[in-house]
Amino acid sequence: MEETIENVEVPSSNVSKQNDDGLDMKTLFVRSIPQDVTDEQLADFFSNFAPIKHAVVVKDTNKRSRGFGFVSFAVEDDTKEALAKARKTKFNGHILRVDIAKRRDRSKKTSEVVEKSTPESSEKITGQNNEDEDDADGEDSMLKGKPKLIIRNMPWSCRDPVKLKKIFGRYGTVVEATIPRKRDGKLCGFAFVTMKKISNCRIALENTKDLKIDGRKVAVDFAVQKNRWEDYKKAQPEMNDKDDNESGNEDAEENHDDEEDENEEEDRQVDQASKNKESKRKAQNKREDFSVFVRNVPYDATEESLAPHFSKFGSVKYALPVIDKSTGLAKGTAFVAFKDQYTYNECIKNAPAAGSTSLLIGDDVMPEYVYEGRVLSITPTLVREDAGRMAEKNAAKRKEALGKAPGEKDRRNLYLLNEGRVVEGSKMADLLTNTDMEIREKSYKLRVEQLKKNPSLHLSMTRLAIRNLPRAMNDKALKALARKAVVEFATEVKNKERHPLSKEEIIRSTKEKYKFMGPDEIEAQKKKDKKSGVVKQAKVIMEVKGSTAGRSRGYGFVEFRDHKNALMGLRWLNCHAVTSDEILEGLNDDEKKQVDNDLGKGRRLCVEFAIENSNVVKRRREQLKQARTKRTRPDNEDTGDVGESENKKPKKEEATTPTNPDDKKMGDDIKRIIGFKRKRKHAKK
């Protein structure tokens, strides 16, 4: 008969003691479990509701699931919470039948013994009083005799034992903290903390009932040495089963208890017998011997087509394309395992360099490494932990290529290409017409092509290129609009209408601004910035080069004080619809009357970081440096001796002033003759 949480009376006494109705208030009995569910999957499901101590799916002698299992918790409240939520939540498409588990009926001797993971049981097994353990010396002060805590439901993000030492160091001296790992390098999901005194452990237990590590609630209990627990278990007699129905339930609970005991007592000092038992188990996710990882595989490749191709090197054990679990589609990679070392070495020896996934086949590439016209990239497989680190590194490289996390090597600032780009399907794309989207995409492709062809070109961090400007807009109006953009961006951030700049972007801006300055120059620049504006220059390109009057070409440039302000300006101005007031900002009354019919209002701006030539920028920087140095020099160093300059001026005047009056008269006669000849020539025409 099923028991539900509604008809279970919760005792007010210690939660670790047995309920009067024979129920274990810390354990759930779970039925209707699908046959393919593992212990780990069951544990993951219930850990969503509360921190669990242990979860086990009961199996028969053939290692097949019997369709039911047990889940134990550290606190009774967690059990009730998990019971209520598990009855309403589907697991692999099924609703599980969950009840409070019954405790087995044991002899009087065993009934007095409480769960080994509680403080009371730890004291009974070790056979020591509180005072004896607090003042323990000699044999009890050895590592095995030290009071130890086990922390279950540990988050995968916590990998440093020092973090645990800091947490539990608040309650007493921490001798050691360990976070065990499996043979494949994966974390076990629990940790051990050894403290100096058992009184420290009790204080820690009382204060860590609601402990969270990295946002995940954990369960803290006493840990007991495995050999002592084994001796204790041998001393306890087993009760015979009463009937067939109870037999299945009791056997399942016994298996559950044994599994729980083994899991809780595992630590670094585990005995050799346990190690031998563990070594017999087949390691999961183990790296296959003589296996390689293949990239640039066609998406339609199958095991049947890959195996014959790689059999050119020798005997193939398997050739499996990698399938994405979420989509069911091929990822374009594969694992291939060979049967012997020689074949494996032959495949690796002449393989093209990793990353050479080009569709263009070089002359030095052997035909064995070309599959359906693609050059295969082949590398030895890695253990899971190394592969994880490699994946993180490759992800960082991809982010750098996308401009999300630029590294120091990107000196051309190519990551800024994506700033201002509008992608189809985005909210900003809904504001633009199809023509505008086509123009933007053409502009992006043109910029990419220019940067590829000329390595001297780079993207400026402070200068913006603005397209689709209204024809009536001049330099003054553009500068006012750029200033407004920075102010409006800051206002929207303050009102939580827009995301602020990231910490990385602000650091990047500061680093770029003071890159070529010394400490004194930095201080002087900071004082200068307080007096100057955020916009250094704004220029609208006119049809007549060099003229300030005339018709605008519809694009211009704005240079900001630093990269931070440039980013703020770009993100606010991009796709901004220019208003009439913004256009007329820089015009006088006469000019306003002339351009009333050509305002071009409603145009949405296309804003990007401008492309610059590094040689021109370098030359300009040197000129500014020379001008700055020239201003700081004394006058006599720059112009020479004052006396000499005064003496030179009269000489120059003497040379240009005619000394003889006849020479002046002769010059006038010559001018008259030249003028007479010119008149005669014009008369003939």
UniProtKB/Swiss-Prot annotation:
<feature type="compositionally biased region" description="Acidic residues">
    <location>
        <begin position="243"/>
        <end position="268"/>
    </location>
</feature>
<keyword id="KW-0677">Repeat</keyword>
<feature type="compositionally biased region" description="Acidic residues">
    <location>
        <begin position="130"/>
        <end position="140"/>
    </location>
</feature>
<feature type="modified residue" description="Phosphoserine">
    <location>
        <position position="247"/>
    </location>
</feature>
<dbReference type="GO" id="GO:0042273">
    <property type="term" value="P:ribosomal large subunit biogenesis"/>
</dbReference>
<dbReference type="GO" id="GO:0005730">
    <property type="term" value="C:nucleolus"/>
</dbReference>
<dbReference type="InterPro" id="IPR035979">
    <property type="entry name" value="RBD_domain_sf"/>
</dbReference>
<feature type="region of interest" description="Disordered">
    <location>
        <begin position="231"/>
        <end position="285"/>
    </location>
</feature>
<dbReference type="InterPro" id="IPR012677">
    <property type="entry name" value="Nucleotide-bd_a/b_plait_sf"/>
</dbReference>
<dbReference type="Pfam" id="PF00076">
    <property type="entry name" value="RRM_1"/>
</dbReference>
<comment type="subunit">
    <text>Interacts with NOP1.</text>
</comment>
<feature type="domain" description="RRM 1">
    <location>
        <begin position="26"/>
        <end position="103"/>
    </location>
</feature>
<keyword id="KW-0539">Nucleus</keyword>
<dbReference type="GO" id="GO:0000463">
    <property type="term" value="P:maturation of LSU-rRNA from tricistronic rRNA transcript (SSU-rRNA, 5.8S rRNA, LSU-rRNA)"/>
</dbReference>
<protein>
    <recommendedName>
        <fullName>Nucleolar protein 4</fullName>
    </recommendedName>
</protein>
<feature type="modified residue" description="Phosphothreonine">
    <location>
        <position position="379"/>
    </location>
</feature>
<feature type="compositionally biased region" description="Basic and acidic residues">
    <location>
        <begin position="645"/>
        <end position="672"/>
    </location>
</feature>
<dbReference type="GO" id="GO:0003729">
    <property type="term" value="F:mRNA binding"/>
</dbReference>
<feature type="compositionally biased region" description="Basic residues">
    <location>
        <begin position="622"/>
        <end position="631"/>
    </location>
</feature>
<feature type="region of interest" description="Disordered">
    <location>
        <begin position="106"/>
        <end position="142"/>
    </location>
</feature>
<keyword id="KW-0597">Phosphoprotein</keyword>
<feature type="domain" description="RRM 4">
    <location>
        <begin position="462"/>
        <end position="612"/>
    </location>
</feature>
<comment type="function">
    <text>Required for 60S ribosomal subunit synthesis. Probably involved in the processing of 27S rRNA to produce mature 25S rRNA.</text>
</comment>
<feature type="domain" description="RRM 2">
    <location>
        <begin position="147"/>
        <end position="225"/>
    </location>
</feature>
<keyword id="KW-0698">rRNA processing</keyword>
<dbReference type="InterPro" id="IPR051945">
    <property type="entry name" value="RRM_MRD1_RNA_proc_ribogen"/>
</dbReference>
<feature type="region of interest" description="Disordered">
    <location>
        <begin position="1"/>
        <end position="21"/>
    </location>
</feature>
<dbReference type="GO" id="GO:0042802">
    <property type="term" value="F:identical protein binding"/>
</dbReference>
<feature type="compositionally biased region" description="Basic and acidic residues">
    <location>
        <begin position="231"/>
        <end position="242"/>
    </location>
</feature>
<dbReference type="InterPro" id="IPR034809">
    <property type="entry name" value="Nop4_RRM4"/>
</dbReference>
<dbReference type="InterPro" id="IPR034805">
    <property type="entry name" value="Nop4_RRM1"/>
</dbReference>
<keyword id="KW-0694">RNA-binding</keyword>
<feature type="compositionally biased region" description="Basic residues">
    <location>
        <begin position="674"/>
        <end position="685"/>
    </location>
</feature>
<feature type="compositionally biased region" description="Basic and acidic residues">
    <location>
        <begin position="106"/>
        <end position="123"/>
    </location>
</feature>
<feature type="region of interest" description="Disordered">
    <location>
        <begin position="622"/>
        <end position="685"/>
    </location>
</feature>
<dbReference type="InterPro" id="IPR000504">
    <property type="entry name" value="RRM_dom"/>
</dbReference>
<dbReference type="GO" id="GO:0005634">
    <property type="term" value="C:nucleus"/>
</dbReference>
<keyword id="KW-0690">Ribosome biogenesis</keyword>
<dbReference type="InterPro" id="IPR034808">
    <property type="entry name" value="Nop4p_RRM3"/>
</dbReference>
<dbReference type="InterPro" id="IPR034806">
    <property type="entry name" value="Nop4_RRM2"/>
</dbReference>
<feature type="domain" description="RRM 3">
    <location>
        <begin position="290"/>
        <end position="383"/>
    </location>
</feature>
<dbReference type="GO" id="GO:0070180">
    <property type="term" value="F:large ribosomal subunit rRNA binding"/>
</dbReference>
